[in-house]
């Protein structure tokens, strides 16, 4: 096993919070592989780069010789995670959950080593729970403690409904740690409450409490909200190489450092050196961003496809095929940087209604990537906009 201080340095890279470092050190000092758990509810059919923040951290643990458990919450997916919700999440059908879970299994091994990964389903133990078992589990936690959770407290004060089954979600997730005898559980910062419930339940069931490692939520392409398919600001790991490369090139110069730290394989020293070179003018931020887009596209599609995507992107962005007299337009990030707004302001369309119609028909591309979202603003940066076959625009979003 690697030296404990080096392990801790590797483990803490990019993490938001570790509870408790002293406890984790003691676990590592035993010299036996730890059981590292991270759960994923298959509520959508595809993984995106936001999900991979946790998966990469699991990979770090694999590289350190520990046992990784990729837990698919096929049972909890039927309940619906209330974390960060202002309303009750509609439950999925069993068929939807199983179909999504199968896709997850196929996608996750683009990052994890399948030989060092245990894939499990929490229906394996929760499916056998009866009414009496649930009542006994519910007795291990209080309503007062449950109401300390920010989203529940807020909804209660605002008079919005909280369904009883939503109280079960953190209990079931917590019991997963009991069933798996987890030493460490990973989750996003929005999962901290649920992870702490797991620690509590392990103590209640006579187990040594798991350590908790929370990871930041990766901002989406807009640089504001967390990456989410429902918000349209995501990069799916199964997207075409051209779309993946183009979307990554659209992130702001500042946001790219966040992506480097959380989802690239570069060392922290390498990232710091790249940042220094950009700040001193030794390297152009576009070229550094291009190296990030190339690295990630290579990971999910291979080097040949990444090279093709890079060439295709540069053919558009560097001016190939873009008329010298293409109009130039600048706008502020926000409402003015939504496609209908900047297309109308730049004179490429007569009205926002016309812009929305053309977008719906698939006529708009941003940096060579088709754009079907008429509502989300583009992040700060420079773009080549193409509308139809002949209309171009060089756009700067401040």
UniProtKB/Swiss-Prot annotation:
Alphabetical GO biological process terms: tyrosyl-tRNA aminoacylation
Main location: cytoplasm
GO function terms (MF aspect): ATP binding; RNA binding; tyrosine-tRNA ligase activity
Catalytic activity: tRNA(Tyr) + L-tyrosine + ATP = L-tyrosyl-tRNA(Tyr) + AMP + diphosphate + H(+)
Motif ('HIGH' region): 42-51
Subcellular location per the Swiss-Prot or TrEMBL entry: Cytoplasm
A GO-annotated cellular component: cytosol
Positions occupied by motif 'KMSKS' region: 226-230
Keyword Transmembrane helix: no
E.C. code: 6.1.1.1
Keyword Aminoacyl-tRNA synthetase part of the UniProt annotation: yes
SMART domains, alphabetized: S4
PROSITE patterns from the UniProt entry: AA_TRNA_LIGASE_I, S4
Positions of the S4 RNA-binding domain: 341-397
Ligand binding (ATP): 229
Keywords: Aminoacyl-tRNA synthetase, ATP-binding, Cytoplasm, Ligase, Nucleotide-binding, Protein biosynthesis, RNA-binding
PANTHER family: TYROSINE--TRNA LIGASE, TYROSYL-TRNA SYNTHETASE
Family the UniProt entry places it in: Belongs to the class-I aminoacyl-tRNA synthetase family. TyrS type 2 subfamily.
Function: Catalyzes the attachment of tyrosine to tRNA(Tyr) in a two-step reaction: tyrosine is first activated by ATP to form Tyr-AMP and then transferred to the acceptor end of tRNA(Tyr).
Protein name from the UniProt record: Tyrosine--tRNA ligase
């Amino acid at each position: 096993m690697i030296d404990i201080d080096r392990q801790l340095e590797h483990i803490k890279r990019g993490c938001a919070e570790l509870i408790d470092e002293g406890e984790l050190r003691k676990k590592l000092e035993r010299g036996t592989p730890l059981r590292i758990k991270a759960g994923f509810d298959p509520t959508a059919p595809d993984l995106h780069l936001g999900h991979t923040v946790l998966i990469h951290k699991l990979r770090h643990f694999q590289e350190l010789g520990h046992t990784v458990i990729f837990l698919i919450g096929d049972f909890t997916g039927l309940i619906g995670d209330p974390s960060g919700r202002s309303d009750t999440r509609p439950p999925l059908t069993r068929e939807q959950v199983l179909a999504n879970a199968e896709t997850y299994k196929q996608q996750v091994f683009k990052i994890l080593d399948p030989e060092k990964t245990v894939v499990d389903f929490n229906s394996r133990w929760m499916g056998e729970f009866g009414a009496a078992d649930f009542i006994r589990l519910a007795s291990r936690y209080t309503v007062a403690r449950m109401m300390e959770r920010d989203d529940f407290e807020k909804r209660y004060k605002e008079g919005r409904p909280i369904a009883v089954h939503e109280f079960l979600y953190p209990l079931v997730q917590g019991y997963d740690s009991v069933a798996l005898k987890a030493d460490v559980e990973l989750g996003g910062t929005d999962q901290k409450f649920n992870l702490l419930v797991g620690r509590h339940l392990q103590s209640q069931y006579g187990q040594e409490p798991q350590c908790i490692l929370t990871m930041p939520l990766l901002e989406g392409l807009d640089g504001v909200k967390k990456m989410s398919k429902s918000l349209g600001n995501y990069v799916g790991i199964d997207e075409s190489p051209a779309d993946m490369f183009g979307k990554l090139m659209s992130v702001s110069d500042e946001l790219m450092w966040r992506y480097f730290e959380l989802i690239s394989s570069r060392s922290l020293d390498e990232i710091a050196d790249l940042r220094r070179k950009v700040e001193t003018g030794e390297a152009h931020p576009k070229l550094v961003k291009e190296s990030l887009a190339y690295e990630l596209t290579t990971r999910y599609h291979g080097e040949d496809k990444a090279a093709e995507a890079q060439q295709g992107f540069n053919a558009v962005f560097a001016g190939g095929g873009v008329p010298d007299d293409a109009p130039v337009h600048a706008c502020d990030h926000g409402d003015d940087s939504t496609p209908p707004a900047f297309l109308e302001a730049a004179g490429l369309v007569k009205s926002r209604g016309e812009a929305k119609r053309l977008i719906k028909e698939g006529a708009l591309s941003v940096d060579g990537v088709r754009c079907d979202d008429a509502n989300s603003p583009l992040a700060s940066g420079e773009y080549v906009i193409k509308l139809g076959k002949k209309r171009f625009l060089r756009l700067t979003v401040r």
